[in-house]
């Protein structure tokens, strides 16, 4: 058994009217939000998937199914913390998190410091160990047409 593991996570949600836009646990002013069973925080869902995957614990859907009433409109920070408790129970600790959020709009840069702080707090790691990159899709495809927002995440775990 190795003492380090890498996990990769991915999530995408459709942009729609009548929903709040929440990324990294931050409510971002925008005319549309992400559609989903929970708060549809694509960034935190990708981080959660990366953590669970690195620990060999499946994915976010197996722990928090979108068919379960108790997760309707759930705060994804709560889900992230619960998933991380499962990861820690298996003897793993997060070392760092590196993420990319692809969104044509809105501009994410003003919100990245708070997103980083939220993830660092939820995982109990230093903010310097959390990175978030905001990218556009250069107006290409469904992301470029502002039909959705996509997130990718990588995490490094060490045995504790």
Swiss-Prot record:
Establish whether keyword Ligase is in the entry: no
Q: Which residues bind 4-CDP-2-C-methyl-D-erythritol 2-phosphate?
A: 11-13, 37-38, 59-61, 145
UniProt source species: Neisseria meningitidis serogroup A / serotype 4A (strain DSM 15465 / Z2491)
| Gene Ontology biological-process entries | isopentenyl diphosphate biosynthetic process, methylerythritol 4-phosphate pathway; terpenoid biosynthetic process
Locate the residues binding a divalent metal cation.
11, 13, 45
HAMAP family tied to this protein:
IspF (MF_00107)
Q: Which UniProt keywords apply?
A: Isoprene biosynthesis, Lyase, Metal-binding
State the protein's name. Answer: 2-C-methyl-D-erythritol 2,4-cyclodiphosphate synthase
């Amino acid at each position: 058994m190795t003492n380090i593991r890498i996990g990769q996570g991915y999530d995408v949600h459709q942009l729609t009217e009548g929903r709040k836009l929440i990324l990294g646990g931050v409510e971002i002013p925008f005319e549309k939000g992400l559609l989903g069973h929970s708060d549809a925080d694509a960034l935190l869902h990708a981080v959660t998937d990366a953590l669970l995957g690195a620990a060999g614990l499946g994915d976010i859907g197996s722990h928090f199914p979108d068919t379960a009433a108790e997760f309707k409109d759930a705060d994804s920070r709560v889900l992230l913390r619960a998933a991380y408790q499962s990861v820690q129970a298996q003897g793993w600790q997060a070392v760092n998190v590196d993420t990319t959020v692809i969104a044509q709009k809105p501009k994410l840069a003003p919100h990245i410091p708070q997103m980083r702080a939220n993830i660092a707090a939820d995982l109990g790691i230093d903010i310097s160990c959390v990175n978030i990159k905001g990218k556009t899709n250069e107006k290409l495809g469904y992301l470029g047409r502002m039909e959705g927002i996509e997130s990718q995440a990588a995490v490094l775990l060490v045995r504790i």
